Amino acid sequence: MAVAVAAAGVLMGSEPGPAEELAKLEYLSLVSKVCTELDNHLGINDKDLAEFVISLAEKNTTFDTFKASLVKNGAEFTDSLISNLLRLIQTMRPPAKPSTSKDPVVKPKTEKEKLRELFPVLCQPDNPSARTMLDEEDVKVAVDVLKELEALMPSAAGQEKQRDPEHRDRTKKKKRSRSRDRDRDRDRDRDRDRDRDRDRDKDRERDRDRERDRERDRERDHKRRHRSRSRSHSRTRERTKGKSRYRSRSRSQSPFKDRKDREKYGERNLDRWRDKHVDRPPPEEPAIGDIYNGKVTSIMQFGCFVQLEGLRKRWEGLVHISELRREGRVANVADVVSKGQRVKVKVLSFTGTKTSLSMKDVDQETGEDLNPNRRRNLVGETNEETSMRNPDRPTHLSLVSAPEVEDDSLERKRLTRISDPEKWEIKQMIAANVLSKEEFPDFDEETGILPKVDDEEDEDLEIELVEEEPPFLRGHTKQSMDMSPIKIVKNPDGSLSQAAMMQSALAKERRELKQAQREAEMDSIPMGLNKHWVDPLPDAEGRQIAANMRGIGMMPNDIPEWKKHAFGGNKASYGKKTQMSILEQRESLPIYKLKEQLVQAVHDNQILIVIGETGSGKTTQITQYLAEAGYTSRGKIGCTQPRRVAAMSVAKRVSEEFGCCLGQEVGYTIRFEDCTSPETVIKYMTDGMLLRECLIDPDLTQYAIIMLDEAHERTIHTDVLFGLLKKTVQKRQDMKLIVTSATLDAVKFSQYFYEAPIFTIPGRTYPVEILYTKEPETDYLDASLITVMQIHLTEPPGDILVFLTGQEEIDTACEILYERMKSLGPDVPELIILPVYSALPSEMQTRIFDPAPPGSRKVVIATNIAETSLTIDGIYYVVDPGFVKQKVYNSKTGIDQLVVTPISQAQAKQRAGRAGRTGPGKCYRLYTERAYRDEMLTTNVPEIQRTNLASTVLSLKAMGINDLLSFDFMDAPPMETLITAMEQLYTLGALDDEGLLTRLGRRMAEFPLEPMLCKMLIMSVHLGCSEEMLTIVSMLSVQNVFYRPKDKQALADQKKAKFHQTEGDHLTLLAVYNSWKNNKFSNPWCYENFIQARSLRRAQDIRKQMLGIMDRHKLDVVSCGKSTVRVQKAICSGFFRNAAKKDPQEGYRTLIDQQVVYIHPSSALFNRQPEWVVYHELVLTTKEYMREVTTIDPRWLVEFAPAFFKVSDPTKLSKQKKQQRLEPLYNRYEEPNAWRISRAFRRR
């Protein structure tokens, strides 16, 4: 109103034109908005100050200059406030009118400026100090604690130091040297301290008991000495003591309140104290004797219920009418408190979830404890009860803030409840006016009869998604704006897309047919034979019959015949055979002739783009040439690979050529495995590992040359490395960057890297004839097999290469092709069928390099791995159906899915080129020329534009890169994907309300895991189950723990069932690892129980590395013992997005999108079907199956993900119930829909 009046006054006085009036109104609106921002952040609402800030922003249009001018004028604004003010002023300030012309010249905004206005959260200023912020905070906390310790030294020592100034100076010097020694020796002492933890914990318990006795004696002496003092003076002293205790509890920076705490922790354990207390979330349960703020939620005749604040979960307690106030008896509770009133209460006791509180012992104004003796008695009784309840509990668990969840369920079961018949009787008596409603046990004066708190687990709890957007994303999420899906297909209605959908349907039909055949075979087994199999002492005849019948359909001859024929049985030899020495092999590579030119090009240019076909020797030779040229004298030579198998195999080969042991001068680093040493000069690694090194050392100071190999694959890590290394080479002029690619799209790389020169390695290429189909093919798998048979029967000698999408498709094609060739008879020339996919053992993959025997032909059926990663000699014919399986992010479900999509034109050219390596060849494209031209993208969509970016955004934020819009991506990811990633990180607690990284987020970025696994592992530290969670995370990181051979499926299932846990699959994996550990990591034990020994050993290595990371960050590894509820809570805290509830009709429904899913048949919970579960991942076979499932309590979802879930309003119908269909009970006399009202009217 004031703004409007002021504006009106300005307009009346000067009588300007309409445009000027509008401009003044806009200016007044801007001033008001700036005043509001200043008031919100600083508590200053000054119009003159707002106008001064606006004038500064008009003169300084960039963030840096604006910030500098504010600092120069004495302003102490945060970066986020400065950014918001500048954006606000530049958006709302009316444009100045030029004096020379009537119409202002508006400069068109660039695309990036429009995006900055539309998504301000993605262009926050970078924070280069974010990498070291965590360490600085740790040091600051340690310094504050040391100051506290020094301030709490006895006063006598202080007086003595005052008398002796020289002694004080000497002490200061000693302190400085002692602090330096402490910093220097802390790492060395940490291992020694960990070994002494158990003994020290026992000593602490003894010291605690002695200290308690001493304190009682001191109190007795204190009373005896001061008995003569006046009562008013003692009351004042007690009040002061209570105030200081209350203040110290609310202050997070005062760790040691008295001498007992100082003796308990000591100086050497300051770091441990910091991580346990400063990093720890609010406690889950109230502590007896402590004082809490609370709010009155309901009023009863016998007292009131108060909800406690400052706890991790919702916790209510009862203040009995006798505990309301000290003065006199209370007749009516409503006279003392009212609903919604803020009060201060002391916790007297709690049993299960029933908590007894007191208001009369607390000063409601200051929070002072008016009866501290009662507090000591309560705590003493609790300690005695706890020690008597569980004497075998490890003492070191007392240092961890973990709830006693194992006792909750037991205590809750002991509570006496009113049975249903008793409730019915009471209701009938109320209806007959024998009892009044007020006497009903569950009566509430304001809301009427409600269910009791104790009946929570019996009632059907409804959980809903929180519809509120994160504060920094308001107006930008999918709730408030339509997000366009990622476009990975050029024409969704074209013939290629239709063929992909048709093939998916056919594959599903084939799977269902095989499953039906297996079920029919199992059903053919007569009933009642299982008792002979299970009986430990059966008669011989019955046992034999049972064994024979159980083996039906599972005999060794059930293994596909084509596999026996393809791999040649036990006599097969693996590996590419050659008669040349290693030196001759190196000299035969195409790159050898260009060795000198290549080294010179690297010397002359800081960035070099190298183009060469697969097999030219780029990966193995360039690093050796540069090492021989002396570049290793300045640092290491690093080479990245997109796949971990490639990094390992290439490093092994280069070490053989280099003449050293693997891990010495030549080594490799992959996730969870480091095979390097201080002598390593050539280091191969996955691109993700180099990205993690950038997190620690952004300038990569230990490297002289970085080589990004296979850059054409454009993995998500490679694209991020492009932007990071582009900055690094500008800072480090002595560093060299080499980017290699097997495709011919080098111009794009060159333009991105400052017009870097291109070095081309000429390869052996021959002309390739390309043939298209006349009509689109609906079943490309069948068309591929027909084409292979036609080539084999009609074309001249030469091997065939077929491209398919995945393992299942390849196995099916091999089986069908083998049967068809077998049906042609023995007169047809032999066709050797060889599959290639990543899950196949590497020694079997190498069989494709063996030449076919005379008079026969081999056909290699492979995934897109054969496009660029493999070079197979002798290929003259290529069959290209035109499809590939890609990982695509589904924004609806929030997960990545493998989807069959058409290839790009660049991939089609690459596949055709495979036929021209040995001689002139042919490429059979099983799609039309029009489809190639109109339905295929020019290049394939980079992974960064079609996958989930939560992990990438977390890494960039940890590096201090907050301005994601200004980050130099080669192909920028969609804004919608970045917004979704930040929303996910916010719900995990990794981002705060301003979109900046939290302390938890920095911890998460330190682990080489997915964000959900990181959250799960870090929360397990606070829940006191990190020992178990380390094992579970390690087991989840490996694949195929259980082995199920087709000839012993029943026995394998029986052995696996021994490890099944009622809580779910995560704890089943934990049981497997612990059993292996208890059997001394035995390989025979693995074979006996059908468990992959190699997978368990890999899990063991992963666990060791994760343990090292936790130790480095001082995160305690604590076991929860038999309290598996803690493990379930930790799993729920990380994977709450993957929660599902049992559906009344079929399977389960996910909470996030109501998708129908099912528990996988191999799960430990398959036959249990619990009400609520969380899953690790979804797998699409015949149905959408949940893998690695664990049961949960729905209340945990609200407890650990309050930003994502909430309890639905019980007075309204939830969304989930609205979607449910009403199914009437079966009635043989009526049709199913006869109960509907519409049918009743129709009958009339």
Swiss-Prot record:
Keywords per UniProt: ATP-binding, Helicase, Hydrolase, Isopeptide bond, mRNA processing, mRNA splicing, Nucleotide-binding, Nucleus, Phosphoprotein, Spliceosome, Ubl conjugation
Keyword set includes ATP-binding: yes
Protein location: Nucleus
Catalysed reactions listed for this entry: ATP + H2O = ADP + phosphate + H(+)
SMART domains to which the protein is assigned, alphabetical: DEXDc, HA2, HELICc, S1
Free-text comment on this protein's domains from its UniProt entry: The RS domain confers a nuclear localization signal, and appears to facilitate the interaction with the spliceosome.
Subunit structure, interactors included: Identified in the spliceosome C complex. Interacts with ARRB2; the interaction is detected in the nucleus upon OR1D2 stimulation. Interacts with SRRM2. Interacts with CACTIN.
Annotated protein name in UniProt: ATP-dependent RNA helicase DHX8
